[in-house]
Amino acid sequence: MDVNSGSWLFREEPLEVIKTIFRRALGAETVREARLLDGGLFNTTYLVTYGAGEERAVLRLGPVERHRIMGFEQNLMAAEAYLYAVCRDIGVPCPEVLAWDTSRTAVDRDFMITRYIPSVAMVNAEMTEERRHDLCFQLGAYLRRLHQVTGESFGFVSRVLEGRHFDTWSGAFLFEVEDIVGRLEAFGGLTAGEAGAVLAPFRRSRELLDQVRKPQLLHLDIWAGNVLLDRETLEILAVIDSDRAVFGDPDFEFAAPWMEDPALRRGYGFPEIAPDDRERLERRRLYRAFYLALDAYVGLGEYNNQALYRDKKEELLELLDIGKM
């Protein structure tokens, strides 16, 4: 499975380990098959057939080499379980969680088991442009519903569930920026001078960031690969991979490069940024810099992808107008 194996975080497990997980988590006495699914670079994912009735479930095993993962990624299974519970309550389709565990007793990794949904990922589905437009519009409406959920504090849900609450958006946002940039420097991806230059515009923008006063629940990973469709009707069956959710600014969600689809933005009713709205424009620039720094670190420290690291670092320094140091 070459598509998976380059990542430092990926590791296959023997069938006996998967049997132990299902026996302890679900009381399943038999596991007939565990088929590795393609595409996992962060988690290692299997489609598992188990039990006397040969039920099927998806097993997601968290990353190995946990010293490499970012701070907000340390508690993602709990965050995903939380998000799926919220989604069920507000009518956003999502997988059913059968079990999740962060004790690392059955296996030395976090894991989650969800009921298998026979489906096709939207990114792989053949459809007309009109149908794709309708689906993106519906996704925007679902996202709007999620953003209407508010929290009592700011920050990544994974952090909040660990008890790390931020009273301000700047506090939550800068905490993550400093963590990511610090990791880039520690792994040799930025010089000390570059790291300081990257952090400077964020640190001097606290007041600007704190104009955001309502902690709204963001998904942060809405794209066609994370949307499961019925193979026949092409209806949306589930929105998945909700573990990187944040209580924060909706503009942060829409600053991501995969959020440019016009139909999705219309379905959401997103208020586009006016050309003379300097404050929102500057926040968007900082948000885009965040995504570039994150992707640069993912390439360097997690996925063993030097091309991704180099490209995103170059874009980051260009966006922030930082020359070679």
Question: What name fits each language-model region?
Answer:
Residues 13-29, 105, 125, 132-137, ...:
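An alpha-helical support segment within catalytic cores of ATP-dependent transferases
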Residues 51-54, 105, 232-234, 289-292:
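Short strand-connecting beta-turns/loops that link adjacent beta-strands
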